[in-house]
Amino acid sequence: MDSLNDIIDHQTFSQELVEDASEFITVGHHSERPSQSSQQPNSGQDLTMSMQDIISCPVKHRTCSASGSGSASGSDSVVMVIDALGQGNRQSAYQIVPQQLQQRNMPLPFGLLERDRQHMQHGREVNTSPVDFVSSDINLDGLTVDADVSQTDHSQETAVKQEQKLLIVQSKSQDQSHRRIRMLVDVSSVNSGLGVHVDDMDEISSDGVGCDDEGVTLSHQHLLEQEEQFGLTSHHPHLQPHTQIIHGLHQRSTHSEMGLDNGHGEVLSVIVHSQDSDKEDCEENDDGDAEGDLENEDDDERDSRSREQLLSHSSYQTLTSVNDRLSSPGFSQTSYATLTPIQPLPPISTMSEKFAYSGHISGGDSGDTDVNGDGAGGGVVEVGEVTNQSSEATGTVSISSGNATSSVCSNNDCSSFSALSMPIGSGHLGLGVLSGVQSPFSSYEKLSSMISPPPNNYLVSCDLHSSVSGRVINSSHLQLSHNGNKKESGTHEHTHRPADVNGGKFSYTGHISRGDSVDNDVNGEKFSFSDHISGGDSGDEDANREKFIYSDHISEGENGPDVNSGTNWLQMHSEREVRLHMPVPAELEARFHISSERRTRLNVPPARGSLSRHLAPNAPICPADWKADDWKHSNAGVVSLTADMPVVVSLTPTPPPLRDDSVSGIKQNERSSPGHREQYFLDKSQEPSSVVADQCSPGINGTPQSVCVIHQQSPSALGNGFQSSSQQAKVSSCASPKGTVSSGGAVSNRIANSSDMEEINTKDLAQRISAELKRYSIPQAIFAQRVLCRSQGTLSDLLRNPKPWSKLKSGRETFRRMYKWLQEPEFQRMSALRMAAAQIPQRAPLSSGMSLGSATGPSGSTGTIPTDLDPHGGPTMIQNPLTNESDSSPASTPVTSVLVGSVVSCRRKEEPQIEQMPQPKKPRLVFTDLQRRTLQAIFKETKRPSKEMQVTIARQLGLEPTTVGNFFMNARRRSMDKWRDDDSKSTMHVAHSRQQQDEQQKDNAHTHSQSQIQDQNHSQNQAIHNSMSQDPYSNLHTTAMSPLGAFDEDADMDLELESHDFDLVDPDEHGDTNDPNGDML
């Protein structure tokens, strides 16, 4: 397969980019009004038309008033072919599409040939080069890119991830009419992060009204040929879905081949194409929505503008590559790998920060129409919507940083899943897994068999090996901005930016609907949802035409216009939250003993009665094994939850963002069927915090069930980051069935744990512990390790010198554990100590006087939530909420109280403690004869070998380097000691010889029988004897320095030394016995 380097002439770009700039991306022309007439491809001169002429299709005429930075009208498909750039700032290596196709003598698709004639007739005024390349300094796999953020006009950063080629293009343009473009990305077997600099070219992701799906994949020749065939049928909307399927399958096979050939992808093609609106699906809507067909067309226009706003607001895209599989550009059912507008990438942290799963899986007709199409600037644009027979042909914008493959769709039964959207803001980096490496999202092909047969099988799992449908409101940068700019039918204003209070975005979660669901709001503010899994027809329309991003919409059965029919409006400040909900299958109910009636609703903002609610900053942490609730009183139609989940959602904590109270008016719509609403929301905080119940609000107009919001506030007594299970939140019950919200304010109900055990008498406690240990003969080491998770020395010091409670900070936890241990029954204390070290994690709550939380609900059933740890050792569930039920009417739904028992375990310290358990002593190392002789020979040559030499010696002899180093160190010490011993012995022998001479001389003087000559001879003989006795010892001084004399007990030198010692025994003993000076020497 030819790479793009073979297709593209590297030397033509720098000139043609400036000369034919209007052919590529024309941003400097004045607003144009294209006619609706469709033009057929003409001659070869059309190849040099402008970019609008090259890749576009006739669009519906629409009046647009450009304000702010300007935009372009029409539904244009932009093709950006990105390849290795040169080393210069202005040099690149690609041509425009028609020239490439001309050089290769290949026919152009209709999408490149067809365009209104008026674009060519209208003169274009390009004052400057419309394309500005950000400085390219960083060489990345043949591509040079630099994020020049210092420039004032370059307001965005560039993000390069994992060896991907990318091109940062910024349009320098004057006023434009609205340009609405959808960007699809084809990447080959590479995870990529591409920041597309979109400043004035606001409309990058949009639906084209009446414009069919066009895509030109310039990855290789095969795809171009495929595109030709695809372009022929692209203008027949009714034939298009089947053509898309065929084209998608061919393209997948081609990309799989290309992934094998190209490795990390020599080519990166950014295909910007617009999708059709699937009007025929709109007609199949079973909602009885008479306005559906008419509004769908307008909705696509407004949705396109809303996405244009979203993109222009964030102006940051990230390319998606999923498991060497690339979704075809025209394949609307699995529009998967696309560009996602997000905030600038933050520095990569140790943990993947935030990850919002989003997708739209619809088993039936789903018509979500937005009449006025005011897309409030959100960071994520209706991510990953996969429609089966849906009228939502809205574009998918998704990111997945792992190897993910969109599942194969067979005909109209599309079982593909929605992409994973990662809203990334500063301080948040969305990665597939916690560690941030390539996450093989558990294979998406499995999802086809799991979701397709019944469209209600909605399978989502959490990355922490648990079953969960996770939603991250990535609110620090996904702040829902509600601009009140009601758009007229053709106008598009950019004045929503001031309305974005924090300029952030607001993420949305899932919509699971089974049956017909038409959701209309009172205020008509539509929260655009991502996970829309509908088994039947679902039409979401607004009355007031303001589109929003709403959280989990789960409905089952007929759901008429929820104007005031009990829809709980979730208003939330854009803080970090996790909204988790999923129907509970029967097996999970049996496992967790959850009543099939109303479940707990935790951390749900109040109903619409008060729209100025704030949620405390909460870090989203995917719970371990959490319970969701059944959405019906019966278990019929429950979404099945299996253990082998295909979708992995990674949720990790991030530091809390700054809060802005002015965003509090933002509403998040959480809907369900009017009479059947049981939801289970868990909200967990990264930091240890007590749970505060606050602002409980009844339902609205007919569903008086209560919703209690639980805040998390200041830290309380925690064990290793876990909140103690005795800390229970006292929840203010809400009793009023009226529309008003009964709020108790921020009622900070602290927990008994921290308050009861304040001011512990540490001295008395230490004495009692010492007495107990002596009474039962409990070793301090066992007690310290198994109960306190401390060492024996620490316990001994604490018992001997306990500090006053007021002077303790982190050390209070140890005394708390002592105190709890004393409060336990005697048999429990002893059993805790007898447990094996391997059972310490299960024993820790018992020894701490805790038990895993189980609270009985109104039906008497208990719900338990086991806790777990993330791979980084941080707490997974650190919340201990207890919600109270409020029965305001017979129809009200009781809220089951759930106690999450926090495990106060010393798991972090256990592992080192277990490793520090006494181990059997290592056997004494004995050198073999070869090793010993080799080491001694080397020591004779060099007393201090270098580290490298020691390593070499150890490798040659099969020893450890430390062993070799110890040998040489010991050899030096022993040689010095031997030298000193031998030197002292020789000195003593010389002195003793002189003493013998003196004595003999005295004896000779007294003996007159001996002559003078005999005395002289005797002295001479004595001197000769002395010299003979000194010679071997002078030799010993040198041999003592050698390893033979130093180490070897078996060597010959040692035998010689022993013979010398034997020779010196009698004189030494004689000298010691006779001469007192001998002892001194």
Curated annotation (Swiss-Prot):
Region (Disordered): 274-326, 481-504, 653-688, 844-875, 978-1081
Low complexity bias locations: 851-867
Coiled-coil region(s): none
GO cellular component, one term: nucleus
DNA-binding region range list: 751-837, 918-977
Extent of Acidic residues compositional bias: 278-301, 1047-1056
Compositionally biased spans, kind Basic and acidic residues: 485-499, 658-686, 995-1006, 1057-1073
A Pfam match: Homeodomain
Localization terms from the record: Nucleus
One GO-annotated biological process of the protein: positive regulation of transcription by RNA polymerase II
Compositional bias of kind Polar residues: 311-326, 1007-1041
Taxonomic superkingdom: Eukaryota
UniProt tissue specificity: Neural-specific.
GO MF: DNA-binding transcription activator activity, RNA polymerase II-specific; DNA-binding transcription factor activity, RNA polymerase II-specific; RNA polymerase II cis-regulatory region sequence-specific DNA binding
UniProt keyword terms in alphabetical order: DNA-binding, Homeobox, Nucleus, Transcription, Transcription regulation
Function comment: Transcriptional regulator. Binds and recognize ATTG sites.
Protein family per UniProt: Belongs to the CUT homeobox family.
Protein name as it appears in the record: Homeobox protein onecut
Provenance organism: Drosophila melanogaster
Designated gene of the protein: onecut
